[in-house]
Amino acid sequence: MKISSFISTSLPLPASVSGSSSVGEMSGRSVSQQKSDQYANNLAGRTESPQGSSLASRIIERLSSMAHSVIGFIQRMFSEGSHKPVVTPALTPAQMPSPTSFSDSIKQLAAETLPKYMQQLSSLDAETLQKNHDQFATGSGPLRGSITQCQGLMQFCGGELQAEASAILNTPVCGIPFSQWGTVGGAASAYVASGVDLTQAANEIKGLGQQMQQLLSLM
């Protein structure tokens, strides 16, 4: 079939695009090239971190951080099983608590809570120990709580308080140090699960009440 002519069809030019930076010719047709401003915006938005502060400032910041860590540890250790987050306000170097204030706070907390734990353990028997050991040895249970208070006194106080708290923690209960009766999954848990001599274990735990009374008298 003879084709006598060609019909030229002009292609419509694309609508103007905001941000186009150049228009060129390719094979007889107009083309537009869209330019992205993202790279320029990224460059414009970049900020440089300031240079490090002076050595003195960095030392102060580090000391403040250490103080927060110690306070946080104590608050978590003596939180009485609370699940609410503890918010510690910012401290200045002048506000950092002294070792004396730490020990005084720990003694005050022990004086307030140990009698409660002793009261809960005063009626302990074999059946209660076997049934409730996991509960007593976690959170704010009387075994965990009393052991935690003794650990705080041993770590942050000195003299007779430290010695008496250490003696209580190391007192054997059916051959297992009392400190291990405040945890789950260890030797004490295995002993309770065995069901052997639980009456003796309960009596020995109650017997520690006299030593804890002596501990309280030293505060």
From Swiss-Prot:
CDD domains: ToxGAP. Keywords: Cell outer membrane, GTPase activation, Membrane, Plasmid, Virulence. Its main location: membrane. GO terms for biological process: negative regulation of phagocytosis. Residues 16-32 have a biased composition (Low complexity). The record marks R144 as: Arginine finger. Induction: At 37 degrees Celsius in the absence of calcium. GO terms for molecular function: GTPase activator activity. Residues 1-54 are annotated as: Disordered. The keyword ATP-binding does not apply. It holds the Pfam family YopE. Residues 101-219 form the Bacterial Rho-GAP domain. GO terms for cellular component: cell outer membrane. Essential virulence determinant; cytotoxic effector, involved in resistance to phagocytosis. N-terminal is important for export, C-terminal is indispensable for virulence. Belongs to the YopE family. This is Outer membrane virulence protein YopE. The lineage of its organism: Bacteria, Pseudomonadati, Pseudomonadota, Gammaproteobacteria, Enterobacterales. The gene is yopE.
